[in-house]
């Protein structure tokens, strides 16, 4: 794994450890993964480590997501990683509230099942996993989390 991915995995694990959500504390409904078709997944991304700021601080993520849907996006991806990409879990909830029932996914460097629970609590329909960041044990734990929601995960390397 690259040094960048190692750093991102460590920071993500630290955020997961700080999370207070637990499955027994939340009664989450089953969310659809798609609306029956798939064309484009549009992305809300504030910053890039290589490009710097991609959006102004004044960006209204809800309005941007609604414009993506009006333009034909079948789903919206929201980058929630805070240190390198300027994202927050709250951004995910904003977008979900703006475009429901359009599927919205959390894009982050996820390493712990609690982070999937956070995504579900924010209303996400799915998450992106980076398989090369996860040990076999972590991948099994995360995939078991999906199955616990009655979902069949799709994974590719």
Protein language model features and the residues they cover:
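Active-site-proximal glycine-rich helix-loop-beta segment
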Residues: 72, 122-125
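Bateman (tandem CBS) regulatory domains
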Residues: 98, 125-126
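Short, conserved beta-strand edge motifs with alternating hydrophobic and charged residues
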Residues: 129-130, 154-157
